[in-house]
């Protein structure tokens, strides 16, 4: 009898276990097959679960007949689970990005649609449509943003936003201001795109939170979290110009409380090319490596603690095709050779208190050893930054953000800028700028939100600096938002970082007066409307802006061809314009993003007769357009991308009235195509063509570099006043000048590569 009862009990347990059912699943991005962590799996009884860091989930008995899967930035999915023990959910990205979480506008994580400041979000999927080895090149297909090359020889550049020059744009990494001043000249080339989670762009004033360098715009590069990054990634690319780029990343655990994200980026281009036959390299030869490591620490109550570091080294040169390093610093063959050593440390620590308080910090050192012909430039910059932020909600209507910041800046070079003119001793420029800021988000009602902000900085020379800001958001509907932003800005120049031409040997720098700091007043209007019909979505993003500058510090190229004259503008400068972005998506197959910008950037100053004269600065276009068009065949795993930009004429710097080069650039365009094939959820291959039209500036001018055959001006003759004299050997009265550049000199090329990912 006992044996029978025991046998019956065992059989009953087995039957009971068999009748129980569990559902396991994974949520993946439909395009990249990358896991989607944090996705919500909602069941019919209103209970829900979240996917883990690898996109996986488990639902134990009882298993519902269907589930509803949602994730930020993706289109929702409703799926049946009948007679299934496992489920693979493919989510298609909602490219309208209306619900994307942003932090740059207010320093607080908030959905893009709810932010009072318009923040544009660009993910790695956007940058993959036209792959590039650096973030500098990746920005070329963003409307209103233009990477500008400033030298035909060394290919230094900066980033223009809405027609304003690079120094008006602040570039941060994870919100830390470590890419500035000296680093902004070459440092933008060393940020690996493989480790970027997203790029957030604020067009217009952001000085109230980020300080004086953000008066024209902000580019915040947000790196991936070690908690969500794949176990291993590899991105390898090569071009027909013999450019080679290897980008590796890996995430792993260190013990039970630390997660690490390690990335290594290597770029090599050593192929000398001279397609325009001026005996100078068309593209700077480069050899660089960047190593990045980010640690995330597990703490009680999920408090944040991260620590990251990056090391960057680059050896680049351009110049005479016969040049090699034995000629470095000499005056027989001209070459511009730059060695860059740079390290960065940054982190964030949420304080162990009941209030939401966090300390952010960064430190960086940038060393540049360079020769521009026979002109040496040895620069050394160190920046230490710390910021304590308190995020406090008061009642139902007010969200306060207050903080204190401290920035230490050290700068030294071998020029007279850091030399005591009385004693001849070296006198590095170093100073501390403390700052305080306060911001209040005031929710008037469900439709209206007002943001009020004020920042105070104390500059050692210019003393107290107030930068107020105000923003108003009006939610006309769930998919329709109107924003108004206004603020002021304050800026002091750094001569080398703002005019690299000062070191090319082409022009000498002259400062005729004590330079006062710039002041700016900005206003920005933004309107967003999103539409949805069945499998078609459309979104419209329109903005208008106006910026007014007093005491603007300008570089005058026109008064004397041998000088760059720095002075405060006796008058005013202004930038105004309109920008429009349109996104269209059809059934997860066809996607298009197109944008156009129309702008009027000018300065007004009095001439000798006392009359106001309005002029347009050099290298500033009146209009531009960008587009990204993609078509996907999901069953075949194929995606086709067509990207490009189009720029209107811009004024170019001429040496004299007899300079035969055109005074304005033609309408020009860079266009690219790419085909990518998803082999598996781990492997993807891609190939394409860059610069389809084979456009280079040499097509519209007799020469790009003036007197490239005499770069040291040994055969140039001058008159008593220092002006260049026309001779039979120099009929146009020119001197060596490589600053006549507005577009890349690199023509058409084929590229290809592979992307490999292990979850």
What are these regions (language model features)?
Residues 28, 42, 70-74, 82-128, ...:
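Short, acidic, small-residue-rich periplasmic hinge/interaction motif at the N-terminus
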Residues 443-446, 544-548, 568-655, 755-757:
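Gram-negative outer-membrane beta-barrel transporters
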Residues 269-290, 296-357, 363-383:
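Flexible loop and strand-edge segments within Gram-negative outer membrane beta-barrel domains
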Residues 646-653, 677-759:
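C-terminal beta-signal and adjacent terminal beta-strands/loops
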Residues 257, 358-370, 475, 483, ...:
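Membrane-embedded beta-barrel scaffold of Gram-negative outer-membrane proteins
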Residues 57-60, 160, 176-203, 291, ...:
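Short acidic/polar hinge/loop motifs at secondary-structure boundaries
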Residues 85-90, 135-138, 155-160, 172, ...:
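N-terminal periplasmic accessory domains that precede
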Residues 136-177, 197:
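Extracytoplasmic beta-strand/coil segments of soluble accessory domains associated
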């Amino acid at each position: 009898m006992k044996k029978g009862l025991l046998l019956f009990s065992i059989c009953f347990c087995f039957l009971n276990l068999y009748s129980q059912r569990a559902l396991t699943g994974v949520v993946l991005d439909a395009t990249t097959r990358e896991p989607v962590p944090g996705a919500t799996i909602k069941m019919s009884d209103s209970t829900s679960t979240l996917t883990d860091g690898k996109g996986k989930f488990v639902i134990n008995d009882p298993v519902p007949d269907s589930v509803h899967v949602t994730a930020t930035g993706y289109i929702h999915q409703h799926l049946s689970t009948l007679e299934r023990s496992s489920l693979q959910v493919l989510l298609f990205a909602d490219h309208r990005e209306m619900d994307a979480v942003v932090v740059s506008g207010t320093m607080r994580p908030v959905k893009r649609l709810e932010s009072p400041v318009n923040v544009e979000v660009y993910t790695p999927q956007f940058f993959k449509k036209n792959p590039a080895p650096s973030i500098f090149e990746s920005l070329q297909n963003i409307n209103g943003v233009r990477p500008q090359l400033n030298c035909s020889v060394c290919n230094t550049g900066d980033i223009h936003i809405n027609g304003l020059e690079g120094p008006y744009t602040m570039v941060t990494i994870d919100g830390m201001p470590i890419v500035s001043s000296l680093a902004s000249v070459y440092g933008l080339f060393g940020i690996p795109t493989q480790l970027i989670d997203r790029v957030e762009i604020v067009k217009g004033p952001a000085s109230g939170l980020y300080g004086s360098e953000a008066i024209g715009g902000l580019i915040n590069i947000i790196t991936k979290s070690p908690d969500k990054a794949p176990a291993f990634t590899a991105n390898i690319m090569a071009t027909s110009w013999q450019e080679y780029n290897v980008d590796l990343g890996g995430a792993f655990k260190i013990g039970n409380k630390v997660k690490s994200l390690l990335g290594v980026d290597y770029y090599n281009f050593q192929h000398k090319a001279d397609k325009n036959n001026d005996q100078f390299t068309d593209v700077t030869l480069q050899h660089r490596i960047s190593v990045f490591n980010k640690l995330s620490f597990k703490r009680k109550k999920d408090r944040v603690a991260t620590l990251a570091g990056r090391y960057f080294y680059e050896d680049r040169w351009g110049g005479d095709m016969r040049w090699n390093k034995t000629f470095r610093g000499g005056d027989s063959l001209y070459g511009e050779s730059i060695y860059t050593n740079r390290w960065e440390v940054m982190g964030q620590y949420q304080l162990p208190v009941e209030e939401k308080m966090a300390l952010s910090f960064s430190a960086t050192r940038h060393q540049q050893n360079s020769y521009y012909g026979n002109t040496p430039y040895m620069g050394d910059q160190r920046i230490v930054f710390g910021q304590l932020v308190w995020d406090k909600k008061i009642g139902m209507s007010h969200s306060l953000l207050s903080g204190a910041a401290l920035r230490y800046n050290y700068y030294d070079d071998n020029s007279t800028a850091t030399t005591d003119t009385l004693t001849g001793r070296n006198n590095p420029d170093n100073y501390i700028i403390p700052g305080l800021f306060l911001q209040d988000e005031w929710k008037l009602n469900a439709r209206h939100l007002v943001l009020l902000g004020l920042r105070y900085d104390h500059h050692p020379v210019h003393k107290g600096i107030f930068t107020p800001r105000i923003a108003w958001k009006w939610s006309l509907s769930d998919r329709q938002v109107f924003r108004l932003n206004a603020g002021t800005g304050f800026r002091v120049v750094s001569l080398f970082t703002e005019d690299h031409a000062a070191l090319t040997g082409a022009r000498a720098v002259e400062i005729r007066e004590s330079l006062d700091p710039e002041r700016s007043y900005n206003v920005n209007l933004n309107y967003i409307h999103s539409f949805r019909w069945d499998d078609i979505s459309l979104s419209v993003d329109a903005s208008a802006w106006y910026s007014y500058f007093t005491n603007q510090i300008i570089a005058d190229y026109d008064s004397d061809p041998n000088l760059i004259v720095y002075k405060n503008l006796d008058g005013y400068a202004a930038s105004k314009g309109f920008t429009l972005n349109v996104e269209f998506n059809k059934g997860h197959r066809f996607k298009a993003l197109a944008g156009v910008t129309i702008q009027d950037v000018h300065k007004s100053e009095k001439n000798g007769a006392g009359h106001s004269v309005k002029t347009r600065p050099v290298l500033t276009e009146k209009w531009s357009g960008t587009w990204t068009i993609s078509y996907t065949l999901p069953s075949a795993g194929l995606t086709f991308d067509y990207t490009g930009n189009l720029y209107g004429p811009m004024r170019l710097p001429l040496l004299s009235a007899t300079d035969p080069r055109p005074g304005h650039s033609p309408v020009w365009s860079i266009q690219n195509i790419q085909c990518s094939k998803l082999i598996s959820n781990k492997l993807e291959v891609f190939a394409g063509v860059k610069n389809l039209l084979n456009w280079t500036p040499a097509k519209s001018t007799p020469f790009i570099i003036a007197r490239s055959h005499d770069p040291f001006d040994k055969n140039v003759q001058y008159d008593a006043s220092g002006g260049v004299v026309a001779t039979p050997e120099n009929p146009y009265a020119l001197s060596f000048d490589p600053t006549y550049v507005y577009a890349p000199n690199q023509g058409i090329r084929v590229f290809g590569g592979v992307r490999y990912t292990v979850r």
